């Protein structure tokens, strides 16, 4: 959430910057509410001063033995009006808050300006795409030929956009996640976490999925027990482990010496893919359920931009060790996620599609999520201030499996196991 004081005091600047990402701020409504708030605030201050004066007069009248009933009646009337003014102020502040919850983060000055993904800017490339001397198969054909991808059975069990992984390909999927976790915890300084896959609305509000993106989530509810007996407990399945990991900081104040806090988790992710009808209907690219290794950092505000570059490097290292060609792209203003001030995407080379596809997004959310969560940091001689949050995929496990199946396919139909995965697969060198 943006700073409400900034929205009220410099709304034109906010509107201009938000317009760069295709968001039209309702300036007229905010200004009208702000004018009402100012009028009520002024009236509240006048009433408080008048009531204080009447209260002093009552004390003086009592001292002189005068009748205080008229003054008491006046104070009572002032009190009623004062309470009404405060109530109206609170209602207006809540209206402003609800508007603010729907406003995305401001793009950083270094973000390229553009309308959509076609205007994203390539930053660098790593690796050279392999030249095949046989007809390339896509990951679906490679996986099915090796008995490891079963979409038909998953459709019977659940419907479209699900898969059953089997045998050595299921094992490779597990190996990829273990490899990523080991890399991030042993070399990059992250603490591994196991997190809830069901979260409450406050958590989703904190990271920015709610209230705007409720249709992208899967929701469920159960009857409460214990102190909550008779109530309905509502949950949503996590769209990413970013949600529970980042919310660890909700309502917390960290000593600045404890930062950065770096956390990672392997979890399934659940997305309705609303608005994606007809896109990537074949294969593992766009699923309702997929696994991801997530990275989250909580950092001092002065260090978040360096932390973003570091996090991108951590995601890149996974691809480099797997020997998968990729490129790094800076998302333009019109393609960034709701909570991000700046985002880099890593796109891996998929030979069957003859293109690069997203496999990781790394974002600096500055104080946008922290303000919603009241996640703060305090120095030795300073008041608590909002910390900065960052998140990144390190990586999407299913899409990494796709990249391995396509880039490591062999002419005889087998799949070579990347060298860094072999210790996780009992030394296996090939599948098939």
From Swiss-Prot:
EC number: 6.1.1.11
Gene Ontology biological-process entries: selenocysteine biosynthetic process; seryl-tRNA aminoacylation
Chain positions recorded as ATP binding sites: 271-273, 358-361
Pathway linked to the protein: Aminoacyl-tRNA biosynthesis; selenocysteinyl-tRNA(Sec) biosynthesis; L-seryl-tRNA(Sec) from L-serine and tRNA(Sec): step 1/1
Entry keywords, A to Z: Aminoacyl-tRNA synthetase, ATP-binding, Cytoplasm, Ligase, Nucleotide-binding, Protein biosynthesis
Residue numbers binding L-serine: 240-242, 294, 393
InterPro entries in the record: aa-tRNA-synt_IIb, aa-tRNA-synth_II, aa-tRNA-synth_II/BPL/LPL, Ser-tRNA-ligase_type_1, Ser-tRNA-synth_1_N, SerRS_1_N_sf, SerRS_core, tRNA-bd_arm
Subcellular compartments: Cytoplasm
The family this protein is said to belong to: Belongs to the class-II aminoacyl-tRNA synthetase family. Type-1 seryl-tRNA synthetase subfamily.
Assembly mode: Homodimer. The tRNA molecule binds across the dimer.
Physiological role: Catalyzes the attachment of serine to tRNA(Ser). Is also able to aminoacylate tRNA(Sec) with serine, to form the misacylated tRNA L-seryl-tRNA(Sec), which will be further converted into selenocysteinyl-tRNA(Sec).
Descriptive protein name: Serine--tRNA ligase
Organism from which the protein derives: Tolumonas auensis (strain DSM 9187 / NBRC 110442 / TA 4)
Gene this chain is encoded by: serS
